[in-house]
């Protein structure tokens, strides 16, 4: 009888040991996205649709992000973001300097291999816009896998619109030869280069 009781206890550990495994719920939207600049925030919003909530810290083109000082409320928004969309290249360092290693940051400079000291006005570059659209979409899919098809559909729609813009720019360049420009600031460099303009700004 003693042997039978002992054997019974030894063969039923599931009844005496608690199950500590818990299931992790699948993430649900919308994704909390914070962009440093409205230029990238508008792109993030278009690609995310109803599956994201996008806040842009700098909303006005009259504000120089170089000199911008975020308020406490701005820092709080950035710290709570699931995804931060930044420009980088020293243009908006305030947006990422206090973030942890786990913060998902999509940076135009990182995507394009630009560093501080390079022309930071990357939103004017067709290559930067295209690469950022893909990078942002990838970040969305990672954060909310259940909406993968919706994100991919929006990306394709954006790419179609961008292609139309690039086609127009290409036709413009073909019909206007030997175009030059001069500028006191490097803001429009990428845009003018994409349109085939040659920079004739005096050095020094």
Language model feature labels by segment:
Residues 8-204:
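Extracytoplasmic metal-acquisition and chelation regions
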């Amino acid at each position: 009888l003693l042997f039978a009781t002992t054997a019974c206890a030894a063969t039923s550990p599931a009844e005496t040991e608690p199950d500590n495994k818990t299931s992790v719920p699948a993430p649900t939207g919308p994704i909390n996205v914070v962009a440093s600049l409205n230029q990238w925030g508008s792109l993030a919003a278009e690609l995310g649709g109803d599956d994201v909530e996008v806040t842009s810290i700098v909303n006005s083109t009259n504000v120089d992000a170089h000199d911008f000082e975020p308020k406490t409320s701005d820092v709080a928004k950035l710290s709570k973001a699931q995804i931060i969309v930044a420009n980088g290249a020293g243009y908006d360092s305030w947006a990422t300097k206090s973030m942890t290693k786990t913060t998902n940051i999509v940076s135009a400079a990182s995507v394009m291999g630009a560093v501080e000291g390079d022309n930071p006005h990357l939103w004017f570059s067709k290559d930067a816009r295209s690469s950022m659209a893909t990078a942002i979409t990838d970040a969305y899919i990672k954060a909310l896998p259940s909406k993968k098809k919706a994100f991919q559909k929006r990306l394709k729609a954006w790419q179609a619109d961008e292609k139309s813009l690039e086609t127009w720019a290409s036709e413009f360049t073909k019909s206007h030869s030997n175009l030059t420009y001069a500028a006191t600031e490097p803001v429009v460099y990428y845009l003018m280069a994409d349109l085939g303009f040659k920079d004739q700004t005096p050095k020094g």
